[in-house]
Amino acid sequence: MHSINFRFISRILGMMCFVEGGMMLSVLMAALLYQESPTPWIATIGVFFFVGALLLHQGRKLHKKRASRREGMLAVTSVWLLLSAIGMLPFLLTGALTSPLDAFFETISGFTTTGATVFTKVEGLPHSVHLWRSFTQWQGGVGIVVFTVALLPIFGGGASQIYNAETTGITHDRFLPRISDVAKRLWAIYLAETFVLIILLWVGPMNLFDAVCHALTCISTGGYSTRDASIAAFDSIYTEYILALFMYIGGLNLTLVYFAVTGKPMRLFKDEETRFFTIFILGATVITTIWISLQGEYPTLEGNIRHALFEVVTLGSSTGYSTAEITLWGPFFWMIALLLMFVNGCAGSTSGGLKASRFLVLIKNLYNEFKKQIHPHLLTPVLMNGRQLSVSVVHQILAFCVLYVALIFVGAMLLMLDNNGFVSSISIACSAVSNSGPGIGEYANSVAGAGGFSKGLLCFLMLAGRLEVFTVIGILTPHFWKR
């Protein structure tokens, strides 16, 4: 095992700082447009460019060679941490937040598309801060690193390692031979979805600014809102159905969505994971509708269906918007909510969570084990889309699921040590690892009341969940650092 090429990592980080500084220019323009102080944004852009220049200088003598898996894992994790560390500056410089820990939490929650917030009220924030919160989620949706791989092919052979570290999971389709081509097309469809959603939201009761912010946070399944009451503040049936549709789309495999809009829709509709995810969402919606109807939550059947659908899709896609106070829906729905947080969208989507494909493999493997109890010599391979998964892939999925669940429960236990309640600890740990945003209980709307240890732990859980556990946990093992 060769030593880690830190010059390679420095060069990636340097390029990412320049990309992020360039992207923040749009927020600077928004500040000028709304006659807000440009100083926080100019200062932060300057820091991005200065740090980027230092890192590029450090990586200037990079020799062309193929990057290892370790370097890809370390680079991606470092990108998220560095951009969150610099990206938190506007919150402090504008006075929106005074605690560096709170500012870091808000930023990494944005970049990981979790959507948990330390703000108790957001409606008084400057327009530029709202746009930055939304923009962090939009960038984190498909992945800042994927964006860089798409536009900066100088990474050469290392591009695939960066891409793989950022987008771990079951992949069925390598529809283009070059990783940079894959990334470019993913970002093209991502941009198209964003612009379509902006127009559709603007047609409704939202003004243009709200439409832009919510389009950015919906298509990325992030969930930040410009309103304290989230989507309920708009009191619009049209808006709720439009957002529910696009949250569902955000939970689909983006590669298959690309095929669907380029003349091959059957690739999407025939995909086994897509069908499972759709049935899962519809089934949870039906059960929830029946439950809240029996509870007498809303006077009309349409109201019960709409609120059930919205909350199921927002949880099932890891978005985190809200039209209702789901804590009041009772423990039965809480269990449905936790299950939705566990599954959370398809592989290759912007959603967090275990992913529908892994959950489906678990079910199939469990079914095969039942059959083996009756017929011990029966050969029962696990199939996905008619293709047999190798034993090593199935074992990897099982290992991932065990680690995923263990991370949630260890995280919940540590949160309980910091004087958090049982329900709140379980829900917010699950929410952080699955990047779902708001939890159940005292942290349903904000984690402002959490202690410093809890907030720091949640930052770690959000990052581990966004990079699908193995990437971050692997870096913490002694074996990772051996030559």
What do these predicted regions represent?
Residues 1-483:
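Membrane-proximal intracellular helices of multi-pass ion channels
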